[in-house]
Amino acid sequence: MQNTIRIIGIDPGLRRTGWGVIDTLGNSLRFVASGTVTSDGDMDLASRLCQLHDGLADIVHGYKPDEAAVEQTFVNKDAVATLKLGQARGIAMLVPARAGLPVAEYAPNAVKKAVIGVGHGEKQQIHMMLKILMPKAEFKGNDAADALAIAICHAHNRGANRLRQAALAG
């Protein structure tokens, strides 16, 4: 008998970190909640990272997910922005890991492929597919929608990930 698995998807960002929580049972997906954790751009970097940490910790504590998935960082031409995003991503991975959750990572194109069928697509396509896959899904903005897409990507890939880990271990 299968158990429901609760997954939190996290789309890291220094200004806004999106989060989305879904329940999975077999191939079925159920929307639970989504939103964003924001940091105050007028504060110093360390304080902003603390805001992200505390906000995500509250979400993880409140929704009690079983597993987490975080989007990988892409490198752009602005090295400083990339480093700051990497620090926010570290928080996004640390919070669920400290709560004892396994944390998976997915490239942005893998997330898009899992949700819309191709690795390159527009935000509107993701929004549309989220509503098709989970008609009761509510999300305000791209960050929360992306986080739900990351959770769905993990739901589709978690079985393959477990098999891969078992093969490497044994």
From Swiss-Prot:
GO terms for molecular function: crossover junction DNA endonuclease activity; DNA binding; magnesium ion binding. Keywords: Cytoplasm, DNA damage, DNA recombination, DNA repair, DNA-binding, Endonuclease, Hydrolase, Magnesium, Metal-binding, Nuclease. The active site is at 11, 71, 143. This is Crossover junction endodeoxyribonuclease RuvC. It comes from Rhizobium rhizogenes (strain K84 / ATCC BAA-868) (Agrobacterium radiobacter). Its main location: cytoplasm. Belongs to the RuvC family. Its EC number is 3.1.21.10. Binds 2 Mg(2+) ion per subunit. Homodimer which binds Holliday junction (HJ) DNA. The HJ becomes 2-fold symmetrical on binding to RuvC with unstacked arms; it has a different conformation from HJ DNA in complex with RuvA. In the full resolvosome a probable DNA-RuvA(4)-RuvB(12)-RuvC(2) complex forms which resolves the HJ. The gene is ruvC.
